Amino acid sequence: MTTYAALLRGINVGGNRKLPMADLRALLDTLGHTGVRTHLQSGQAVFTTGRGDEESLAGELARAIEDRFGFPVDVLVRDHAYLAEVVRACPFPAAELAARQLHVTYFSAPVTPDRYAHLDQVALLPEEFRLGDRCLYLYAPDGLGRSRLAEALGRPRAAKDLVATSRNWNTVVKLAELTAPEA
């Protein structure tokens, strides 16, 4: 049995694509998963299962959400080992930064630096980003809402052919904790 986090993209934002967390928990239960929990209202669920892999579990959940709620949702599923490594490998001094300054964008596939070669990173300072394993770490000292770099990273050219969803550092750390094996 493996514990996973499901990351849903773009739900419950600005009153659009509403998906109550109680309904998401119930849906995961009906799919046969155990230990189902949600974190916040922005589309994080934790569950345990003994079947499937990250990609098949994400596809199953995305189809079930569309069937049940009538709208498509991009879903990424990641296990504890991956989530813990994202925390461990952070290239920025996470302990020194406010959670609103540090974000991780999770990707459905590996990303290479050439995808972002068109960005003038010097012009976007003091904001910075670094690539990780199927993720991108973003340091935005004034927060994500005011970040010119976040806007540039999210443009279609930069996100082409990928499912991508971002979380602030507090959520990144919490998901690693919630998926950890029980002692």
Predicted regions: what they are:
Residues T2-A183:
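Surface-exposed, charge/polar-rich loops and edge strands
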